[in-house]
């Protein structure tokens, strides 16, 4: 069993494990108990009431956070010609065609978001073993397979996040850094939850969001009261 650090144990004592905290109180607690020396990510975990075994109940989507995530994002784009230049002009870290495909096939994955033009997806699709497990495979449903790669790059750099249920019906996403104000984190959360609610499967019945937790990177979690 992993031994928790003294700082972690100290942080946990300020959180009542059997209590559900209002959103702003929970945000404040996470900020107060973020003991890490780095500016930690502010993480949200949701437990949904869907049946993850049914493909028509999977929840997936993208959302633009009004205050961004606070994270420096590295974006690579599979594109050639004018599209490649548009991606570079928009701030992509790296752009390429078959040459970039070959590099990724050899193990290059030092990036956070991958975007592709439709024309190159025949090649990019062969990178499933490399990109798939890391959640980096471009997908038209999340706007990362598009002819307008310039806009996609700007969105990725400007606070765009993806969400997707795992096999246990959980969704994990980041709404900023612990250095963000309570107001900024609250607004980012509200926008994200609105989009997740819009993605509710039509055939789902019963309570949709069953539990919600906040935490910082390596910090203790706080259970949040649902409205």
Curated annotation (Swiss-Prot):
Alphabetic keyword roster: Repressor, Ribonucleoprotein, Ribosomal protein, RNA-binding, rRNA-binding, Translation regulation, tRNA-binding
Gene Ontology CC entries for this record: large ribosomal subunit
KW RNA-binding (keyword) present: yes
Gene3D superfamilies (UniProt xref): 3.30.190.20, 3.40.50.790
Lineage: superkingdom: Bacteria
One Gene Ontology term from the biological process aspect of the record: translation
Signal peptide positions (record): none
Keyword Repressor applies: yes
Matches recorded under InterPro entries: Ribosom_uL1_bac-type, Ribosomal_uL1, Ribosomal_uL1-like, Ribosomal_uL1/biogenesis, Ribosomal_uL1_3-a/b-sand, Ribosomal_uL1_CS
One GO molecular-function entry: tRNA binding
Family: Belongs to the universal ribosomal protein uL1 family.
Subunit structure: Part of the 50S ribosomal subunit.
Function: Binds directly to 23S rRNA. The L1 stalk is quite mobile in the ribosome, and is involved in E site tRNA release.
Name listed for the protein in its UniProt record: Large ribosomal subunit protein uL1
Organism from which the protein derives: Tropheryma whipplei (strain Twist) (Whipple's bacillus)
Lineage: Bacteria, Bacillati, Actinomycetota, Actinomycetes, Micrococcales
């Amino acid at each position: 069993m992993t031994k928790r650090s003294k700082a972690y144990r100290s942080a946990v004592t300020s959180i009542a494990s059997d209590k559900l905290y209002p959103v702003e109180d929970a945000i404040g607690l996470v900020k107060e108990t973020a003991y890490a020396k780095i500016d930690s990510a502010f993480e949200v975990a949701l437990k949904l009431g869907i049946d993850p075994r049914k493909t028509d109940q999977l929840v997936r989507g993208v959302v633009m956070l009004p205050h961004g995530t606070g994270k420096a994002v590295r974006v690579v784009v599979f594109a050639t010609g004018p599209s490649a230049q548009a991606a570079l002009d928009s701030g992509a870290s790296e752009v390429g065609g078959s040459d970039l495909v070959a590099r990724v096939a050899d193990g290059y994955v030092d990036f956070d978001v991958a975007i592709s033009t439709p024309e190159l997806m025949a090649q990019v699709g062969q990178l499933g073993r490399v990109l798939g497990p890391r959640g980096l495979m471009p997908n038209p449903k999340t706007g990362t397979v598009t002819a307008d790669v310039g806009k996609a790059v700007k969105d990725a750099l400007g606070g765009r996040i993806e969400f997707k249920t795992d096999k246990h019906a959980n969704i994990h996403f980041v709404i900023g850094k612990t250095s963000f104000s309570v107001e900024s984190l609250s607004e980012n959360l509200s926008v994200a939850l609105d989009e997740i609610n819009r993605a509710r499967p039509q055939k789902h019945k019963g309570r949709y969001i069953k539990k919600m937790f906040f935490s910082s990177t390596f910090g203790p979690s706080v259970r949040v009261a649902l409205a």
